[in-house]
Design a protein with these regions (language model features):
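Short, acidic loop-to-helix structural element flanking the phosphoryl-transfer center
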Residues: 75-102, 108-112, 141
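Asp-based, Mg2+/Mn2+-dependent phosphohydrolase catalytic module
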Residues: 1-18, 108, 114-214
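Short hydrophobic segments within beta-strands
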Residues: 23-24, 103, 161, 181
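Hydrophobic alpha-helical core bundles mediating ligand binding, dimerization, or RNAP-core interactions
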Residues: 35-42, 70-73, 111-114
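Active-site neighborhood of HAD-like aspartate-dependent phosphohydrolases
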Residues: 1-61
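A general structural signal for well-ordered alpha-helical segments in protein cores
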Residues: 35, 50-51, 62, 66, ...
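Short, basic/glycine-rich phosphate-binding loops at helix/coil junctions
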Residues: 62-73, 123-128
Length: 214
């Protein structure tokens, strides 16, 4: 029998925020992207941010490589699997009346396909999904701010859940509470993190415990 995790002091603050925004790849889904291979296929220097590099290229070349990136990500979409606890978490939040959205460095079209594929598409209307062509890519807070504005609120009413530094920086800059999901438990960016968990299963358990104590 596993020991119940003691509630984190930040959990009541998370539950008080009626808008939750998720990263998709590696957060709601298990990681499938081989970024080194993608960089090689696109000619992006090792260690460089893929989108940032493509945007520095001449327009015709940038457009061509963005198209190739779209093809790669469309192929990966068919292999996506829900991360542990993803369905449990979004179901618990939905029952609470939380409004949910996605801010991803993928495209909206791929995101819609992935979310349907992993069985959570009904929780995320198309208008609540912002991809790299809909807002400035993370770590810019633009995606969160745009979603919040469309909901008639601000980033300070939101929670941002993600697995990478850019997600946390994006959330912090927008005024959102940030949740870092890290399967390795390294938790490398505490300065940008309000709550750290190893999985969405763990986060779902904390949310359910918090609700039961209200």
């Amino acid at each position: 029998m596993t020991e119940e995790r003691r509630p984190d002091p930040v959990v009541p603050d998370l539950l008080a925020r009626p808008y939750w925004i998720f990263d998709m790849d590696g957060t709601l889904t298990d990681p499938v992207h081989d970024f080194a291979a993608i960089r090689a296929a696109l000619g992006v220097p090792e260690g460089s941010d893929i989108l940032g590099y493509l945007d520095t290229l001449p327009e015709i070349e940038s457009r061509r490589l963005h198209g190739l990136l779209d093809e790669i990500e469309n192929e990966l979409a068919g292999r996506a699997e829900a991360s542990a606890g993803a369905r449990r978490l979004v179901t618990a939040l939905d029952r609470r009346g939380v409004r949910m959205g996605i801010v991803t460095r993928n495209t909206r079209q791929v995101a819609l396909r992935v979310l349907e594929h992993i069985g959570v598409g009904s929780y995320f209307p198309a208008g609540s999904i912002l991809g790299r062509h809909d807002a400035l890519p993370k770590p810019e807070p633009d995606g969160i701010l745009r979603l919040a504005a469309s909901w008639g609120t601000t980033g300070r009413s939101a929670v941002m859940v993600g697995d990478y530094l850019f997600d946390l920086q994006c959330g912090r800059s927008a005024g959102a509470l940030t949740v870092h999901v890290d399967r390795t438990r390294a938790f490398r960016w505490p300065q940008f993190t309000d709550l750290a968990v190893a999985s969405l299963e763990e986060l779902a358990e904390l949310v359910e415990q918090g609700i039961s104590r209200e």
